[in-house]
């Protein structure tokens, strides 16, 4: 996936009110960007980091500029726009870049499922194969090349794991897919130190037949694509 039109560069001054960030452009202009990430963004929003942003042609938007990527002061690229996790995963499935999810003839998005009536990110179907339910999570929290999810306690994420376990119990295929959107991450684990319950449920889910996949994106200011499978340690 290529960014079109190209992203523009600025330097982060501060992120605040969760959805806003002030930056300064190379020519000295101060802008306020929309921040499409409600998480803690630990390590992704340090003042002085390089920010790459897009600009909408919708003149009615109060904040037409959107923060897409962070380029940290150590050089790592991080996709902070959480919407890209699903877009990149869909693209990779359709391109059959994810070997574990290849060979299906139909892909549906936002399908209602489960006892708690959640919406699954993707459902894959093919003749003579069980349906495949895929829940996608964006991973940007990193420490010493170790990627973690979540970056804050997530009751919603816990619910999704319970739903996937119920799907697996019914004989369907259930997959939790971690889209790693941080160029410095080389391996993945649940963030037990942040959300112990989520880590416990993820281990239980694996024992009950839920598949756990982690794929890392190649990220630059020009574009992104999910390419590489990463090891997962529970």
Swiss-Prot record:
Pfam families: SfsA, SfsA_N. Transmembrane segments: none annotated. CDD domains: SfsA-like_bacterial. The keyword DNA-binding applies. Residues 201-220 bind DNA. One of its GO terms (molecular function) is DNA binding. Disruption phenotype: No visible phenotype. The keyword DNA-binding applies. One of its GO terms (biological process) is positive regulation of biosynthetic process. Keywords: DNA-binding. It comes from the Bacteria. InterPro entries: SfsA (IPR005224), SfsA_C (IPR040452), SfsA_N (IPR041465). HAMAP family: SfsA. Belongs to the SfsA family. NCBIfam families: sfsA (TIGR00230). Binds to DNA non-specifically. Could be a regulatory factor involved in maltose metabolism. This is Sugar fermentation stimulation protein A. The gene is sfsA.
